[in-house]
C-alpha cells in the first residue's frame, strides 16, 4: 500500500491550500492575505471556512501568517477620520487562560492613562461566558454604541478610549456564528489583539500559552510597532502574574529580546493566583471600581502596577520597570485611574 505524500502546488487552489495546512505546512504571507480576504468577502463556504479554521488551529500559527491576516483586517476597518496623529498604546490579551481573574488589562489601560500614556484599548465581550472588557465597562456605564468619531475624540479628552471590536470590524460579524458552532478557539482569538484599527505604535499583549510568545512577538515586529511587550504570566495567565517569574518578549527598534521578570524584582510581593480571582459581572465591576479608586486588595493593586509598568516601558515614559511600577502604584493609591474612566464615560455619553 503506497504512502500518502503532501504536495506543494505552485499556485494552489483552496483545496490545495487546505492540504498544505493538513500536512503541517505554513502559508506564505500572500496566501494568508488571500485567505483572509476570501473570508471577509464571504467567498468561501461555511464548510471551507470551518476546515481552514480547524487546519490552522491544528498546525499552529506562524508570525508571518498572523501579521498578514492582521494587516488585512486592520485595513478593512471603517475609520470615521484620519488616524489620530498621537503615540498610542494598546493593552490587550488573547484571553483563554481559564484563570477567571478580574479584568486586569482593563484596569491597566486606565492606570496607564493616569500615568500619562494615551491608550486606545481594543476589546470585546467574553466569548467564554466569563466577563470580558466590554462587559465590565458597559456595566460601569460606558456607551459601547457611541459613534466611532466620538470614540476617537475621547483620546485627547480622557487620555484613553475603548474600541469595541464588533463596531470596528463589521465584516467579521458573519463569521461569528460559525466560530461559535466550532466551540474551540481559532486564529481569530489570536488576531483580536493584533487588529486595533488605530494602529497603535506600542502595545502590551498577553498570551495564555508559552508557545505563543514568539509567534505573537514576531507578528508585532512585522506590523511595525515601535515598542511592544508580549507576556506569558506565571500560572498560565495572559498577563504578568504575581505568582512567580513571567516570560516576556520585548520588541524595540525591530529587534526581539527574551526576559524573565519576577514581581519581587520590582519591589512587589508574590501572591497566589487565588488573590486575583474575579467572578460574575457584578463582582468584576465592583473589583474594577475598587481597584481604580485605590480601594483594591494589595494583590489586586500590585498586579495592575506590575502590568502598567510594562505599558509605561512600551510608551517610552519610564524605561526603568521598578520606577514605573512605583509610579503606577502611586496613581492607583490616589484613585486617579477612576477619574480617567469617569471622564471617558461622560465623553461617550455626550
Curated annotation (Swiss-Prot):
Single GO biological process annotation from the record: L-tryptophan biosynthetic process
Known EC number: 2.4.2.18
Binding, anthranilate 2: 179
One GO cellular component, as annotated: cytosol
KW Metal-binding (keyword) present: yes
Binding site for Mg(2+) 1: 105, 239
Organism in which the protein naturally occurs: Parasynechococcus marenigrum (strain WH8102)
Family label: Belongs to the anthranilate phosphoribosyltransferase family.
Binding site for 5-phospho-alpha-D-ribose 1-diphosphate: 93, 96-97, 101, 103-106, 121-129, 133
The gene coding this protein: trpD
Domain of life from the UniProt record: Bacteria
A Pfam family of this chain: Glycos_trans_3N
Keywords: Amino-acid biosynthesis, Aromatic amino acid biosynthesis, Glycosyltransferase, Magnesium, Metal-binding, Transferase, Tryptophan biosynthesis
Annotated function: Catalyzes the transfer of the phosphoribosyl group of 5-phosphorylribose-1-pyrophosphate (PRPP) to anthranilate to yield N-(5'-phosphoribosyl)-anthranilate (PRA).
Associated pathway: Amino-acid biosynthesis; L-tryptophan biosynthesis; L-tryptophan from chorismate: step 2/5
Name assigned to this protein: Anthranilate phosphoribosyltransferase
Binding site for anthranilate 1: 93, 124
Subunit structure: Homodimer.
InterPro entries named among the record's database cross-references: Anthranilate_Pribosyl_Tfrase (IPR005940), Glycosyl_Trfase_fam3 (IPR000312), Glycosyl_Trfase_fam3_N_dom (IPR017459), Glycosyl_Trfase_fam3_N_dom_sf (IPR036320), Nuc_phospho_transferase (IPR035902)
Cofactors: Mg(2+)
Binding site for Mg(2+) 2: 238-239
Reaction catalysis annotation: N-(5-phospho-beta-D-ribosyl)anthranilate + diphosphate = 5-phospho-alpha-D-ribose 1-diphosphate + anthranilate
Bound cofactor: record note: Binds 2 magnesium ions per monomer.
Annotated GO MF terms: anthranilate phosphoribosyltransferase activity; magnesium ion binding
